[in-house]
Each structure stands twice: as C-alpha cells, then as structure tokens.
Amino acid sequence: MSVSDKRVTPAQARELLGEGFSQDLASRVEERLGVDVIVLPLEKPGYSLQLGNRHVIVVGATDRWFRSNFTIAHELGHILFPSALNGGSRRDEDAANAFAAELLMPETMIRSMSWTDTNPHLIAEHVWTMGVSTQALRTRLDYLRPPVSDAVRSILETPTPRLIRESLSSSVASSEDVTERMARSARRRFPQRLLTDLRKAVEVGRAPHASLAWALGVPGEEEADESSEELSPDLLDGLV
C-alpha cells in the first residue's frame, strides 16, 4: 500500500503503521505506507528523495535507534504532510519536527500518562515503547506542559542508553532485544524490492554491477571510490 501521494496526519499515520510500530519503524513504513527506507553511513541524519513514483527515506546508520526513529518520522513529515514540504526552510523543518513528535509521542498519549511518578523503570518503559530519546521526550513535555515533577525531569536528563541499561525491566525488553534494536539501526539496509529490481537490471545490462555491489555493501568487480555513501540516483540507473 502506498499513501505517500496523499495528505496523511500523524494520527492517521499511527493508525496505518499499527501497534508497536516504533520497534521496527523502517519495516512498518515500507509495509504499511509504501515508502522505501535505506540505511547507509552518512555524515548527516538523513534525507528523502523520489525515485520514479516511489518515495525513499535515506537514514544515517547509527547505533542510536531512537535517533533513527526520529529521522524517519521527520522525513515522513516532509513526504506525507503538505505543511512540511521538503523545501529546506526553517518553517518546513519545524513542521516536519512537529509531525515526528506527534507521530512518536502523540499529545493524547502524553496527557494520559502521569509525569509525577518518579519510578525510573516506568520512564524507561515509556522511552522504549515510544522509540524516542530522553531528550526528545523532555522537549515534548516542555512543549505540551503537562504536570511534570522535578524528579521525572531529573530522570530524563539521563542519557538514553544509560537509562535503558539501568532501568528498563527485562519483562519489557531483554538485553538481546536492546542489542537487536541497536543493530537494526546501525546495519546497512536496502528494501528487498529495490535489491531485486537492481539485480534484474544488472542481469540485463540496464545497470552497472557496481550499483548492486554498492547496495549490498560488498566490493564490486572494479573498486569504486567509496569516499561518500550518499545515495546517488545515478547508482540506480535502470530502475527509474
């Protein structure tokens, strides 16, 4: 299903993505919204572009899964929400950030929770379930202004990896779950559909083999300049 040619609100996107979407946001975005997600080593958090009739989000590989989530959500704002057009202006970026915040930390959810309970295990569970950083949640609370105790604010000053390590209950997520989530956001990733199309294009001579090798993250038949991992549409010749 592709909804990237329609106006979609954060609430509608949440419904389409389904329960627990933040645990593997890249896969849900592809499966439920028809937007491809690519993960590569980048010098910046990410960006979005269009290849043929498909929207593509390119995310910088990082072990900070919460950063990947917010980047994907931010780029979805540019794609799905007209007021967050990808024009590069401060207004566009602010609108995309607002979309991401409402997608991951909806106002109704934030206001339904108690932010005076000083249990760090509960705060860690909120961070894990929403798929955000302590900083992002702190910023969201500052914006929405629900009652927040000083103790909760102090907990949210804790770096996200440390809070997860020290306070996330194993009944919510195991140590292996945390590692897998971290590995997913750091692992080079290309949609299976795109890899299949690229392989077929190479086989019939419509794309260079170096393109497929680059997408797979392996040396090509002829070593290319790997000084930049930026996604170039030229590397996907034959697909569009």
Q: What is each model feature region?
A:
Residues 1-240:
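Active-site hotspot residues in diverse enzymes, especially metal/ion-binding acidic/histidine motifs
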